[in-house]
Amino acid sequence: VVWTPIGAYPKKFSGSFDGKGHTIRNLCVDYETAAQGERVYLGLFGCVEGTKEQHAVIRALQVEGSVQAASGFSVYTGAIGGIVGNAEYAELSGLVSRVAVSADENVGKAAGLGGLGGVLVNCTLTNCGNEGDVSGVKNLGGVCYELYSGTMTGCYNTGSVTGTGTY
């Protein structure tokens, strides 16, 4: 079964999710863009957005599986991660991603790919890890591709990160 991300753009997830230490196995996000210029946000959660006063929360969860994106044309923008594609004002804690994250050259040039999270803005990551492999053209990272105005404490990456592009 192919998974549709929780909080698919533009309907972002803004609540609290406590995995209570459980493991989600065989996650399968196999996405092919449907329209040129489409925004791509993929993972167990596609888009997560809290506020400065009330952060969204995802905690105590392990995820295993794969997230892959392909397109016959360049996408506008996007973020792809094993657990979270894009997040703003979120607290992520006790998360482990064992998800293989990949994108073809058309998606990979525009999207940020990370093992646990793609693009994270004003987020706090605590005791999180990525053990899955990340592959694409460029814009790649282990735990996440980009953490902007946030903090990361006690996090690790053991997955490989492989880029095939040049600047």
Model features per residue range: what roles?
Residues V1-Y167:
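Surface-exposed repetitive/solenoidal architectures
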